[in-house]
Structures are given as C-alpha cells and as structure tokens.
Amino acid sequence: MIFAVSLSLFACGKVDGDGKENTTGNTPTVDKTEDTTAEVTTAAGMKKGDEGNGPADINAEFITLKLPSGYKYEVDSFSKDSKNPLKGNVTLFIYKDGSYSSIATLTATARNMVRSQEEAVENTIKLCNLQTYKNGKSEIGKDAKYGENTYSTIHVSTDYYEKDFFVTYANRGTSDTTGLLVKLEINNKNIKADDPFIKELLDSLKIVMA
C-alpha cells in the first residue's frame, strides 16, 4: 500500500520581511514546523500488516474514517468478494503512539449475514460468549449517536477483562442483501468508553453506500 503523505519534521532558516534568510550571529535561528497534512490511505492493495500514523484519512472500502494525531493503525485483515463488491470485511487495530498494545479493534464486515441492528447486537454477544472464559456477562446499554450512525452499546465483563462495544448496521442499497456490520471493540484496561478519542473516531466514521 502506498501512503501519499507522511508526517515529517523539518528545519528551515528564519526569514526576514524582505524574503531573505536571516544569518545574523554565529548560529541561525531555526524554526521546527510540523506538517499536519493527513496521510491518505486507500483500499487499493490493502493487506494484512499495512500500517500508518495519524493524522490519517483512511478509506477501507466499506468504511472511511479519520485517525487523529497521536495514534496509529494496523490492518489485521482485509478481503473483498471479487463477484460481489458489497461483500467482504476489514479489521483495523488502533494503537496509541509508543504503545505495543492495541486500544481498540475496528471491524466492518458483510459476511455475518445479519439483517438488522438487533441481529448485529445478538451476533456480537454470541461471538463474545464463544470467546470468553467463565462467568462472562454482557449488558446492553443505551444507544449512542456519533456522526451519521447510531450505535448500540454493549459492556462485556469476565473474570479476566472488561470490554465495551459500539455496534451499528446498515443496508447499503437495494442490491445489498447482506448488510454491513460495523463494530468498535475497546479494552477497558487501555482506554475507557467515554474517552474523547472514541467520540472523535466514531464521529468521523462513514459507511460507504452502494
């Protein structure tokens, strides 16, 4: 995958009002300016292991989103049905800069065969039950509106961890017989559900319609 623009730090000589570089004194004054232009990531050629740093505009085929500065992402999986472009899935791991442990997992999939928001929630809980150890408990909370989407919230607790899920579902057109399930999973050990980053991320997330 090709990243169009990378973050960079560059040094330049201080410029006077006449446009000439100021060389007064033995050591020129140095300004360090951060280029905050966002990376642009497209779905073309996306594959497992691809990664990038925020700020980034990410086009992951089925969804688009903006990752703010101070965070990075890694593609865990990406696939697209060659016969039906509406079918496929993408999973992204999200990290804080300098951390080796992901704070969130974002998944968009059209392979679960769910046909409603209610089924999307049931599917998420079912997968949690399969993956949890003993004494797992799932609680459905209040719906939350972020950006263009309304998310069902699920809190999962076990003897070993606590997680929160934000789940939404969309039909993307008359030819879409599967629907798209979008799920953000966060581990409470690394980040909380009310962290401003979660709102910023979900506010930016858009589902690509057919």
Segments and roles (model prediction):
Residues 61-118:
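Secretory pathway targeting signatures of secreted, lumenal, and periplasmic proteins
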Residues 71, 178-210:
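Surface-exposed amphipathic alpha-helical segments
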Residues 123-173:
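Signature of long, low-cysteine stretches enriched in small and polar/charged residues
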Residues 1-10:
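Sec-dependent bacterial lipoprotein signal peptides
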